[in-house]
Amino acid sequence: MHREVQRYIAVIKNPLVILYRLLTGMACYYDATNWSERPFFNTRGTRNKCVVINPENNIDYYFKTSMLKEGKNYKPEFWSEIIASEVGRSLGFNVLEYNIAKHGSDVGCLSQSMNSDEESLTEGIGLLTGYDNTYNPNDKTSYSAYTFDFIRKALEYFQWGEYIDDIIKIVIFDSIIGNSDRHQENWGFITTLNPIAREGNKTLVNKLASLLRIKKNDVKEIEVTIKLIPMQGRFAPIYDSGCCLAREKSDEDVTKLLRDSLMFDSYINRGKSEIRWGERGEKLNHFALIKEIRKAYKETVDNEIRRIIEVFNPNNIREIIFNIDIALPDDLKASYALSEERKELIYRLIINRFNRLKEVLL
């Protein structure tokens, strides 16, 4: 069944949730406790995730909690994901919609699968390793290779060079929310491959592997490269943006940042993009990175920033942030609702970052 038809049926079956979002524009709440969990389905990233099936439309949804491990108790992280989504979409970015959800005893964020059964998400890492098979993001010696120029070359290699504008838009979006973790698995393409072509490629790969005596472990990498070349696709909505908006700060630190302007400015200045710059792969402040990109893509950068300036409304941003948890059930608010102080800090961070973004045009 076509994705849009499934989405329409979901609206009919669950009208109250949809009506709530339409009337308020705020994130909805779902209790996914009784949704079936898809077994043996691994998802990448640093947070606890699982794939659950919505019984009302039989569509996969991704449920994520905050990072909770020794030394990194980032309880507000799932809120950062939801706020980033709401703010981004209010500013006209193509951001995946995230809502509030409960799954068993866990509370986190929920997003609908971006692709249909006939499609797949091809993450950036697939393009980068397909372009350069020596690149290994798990090897610290490769960290510095993850640069804007490396991404550009990989896109051009697979004849997707025009999508560099989408990468630039992501960098600009990240500068507004302060996202510091736009790694190779946090952007990608929704791709479609004809099943006959897929099987044909598989046969071709196996024949090549046998002929060239290629190790079995290397076959998958070659198969990915061959598959990518003929595929048609579109740039995926922006997703996995939760590493932002002071999600790592304790309540005590939040208070300090609100009271100390020097500490507040220093915190923003220290924020750097995961996408690096230059031959040395230097990590730059978000705004410094945009300025460097602007030297070669002035029209793209300027047009995007001007577009954001036209739609940016501080009152709308404030309303989103201070009402983000309004749909959270009362019995969960004591443990999971955001404090007014944290909301104020998030608001100030976005306003300050937006003002700095405007200065790029000067």
Regions found by a protein language model. Give the residues of each.
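Hydrophobic residue at the +6 position relative to the catalytic HRD Asp in the kinase catalytic loop
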Residues: 187-189
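Low-complexity, intrinsically disordered or signal/transmembrane-proximal segments
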Residues: 2, 6-8
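ATP-dependent phospho-/nucleotidyl transfer catalytic cores
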Residues: 114-171, 198-206, 210-217
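Conserved ATP-binding subdomain of kinase catalytic cores across diverse folds
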Residues: 17-134
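C-terminal catalytic region of ATP-dependent kinase domains
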Residues: 76, 194-362
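Canonical protein kinase catalytic loop motif
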Residues: 183
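Glycine-rich phosphate-binding P-loop
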Residues: 180
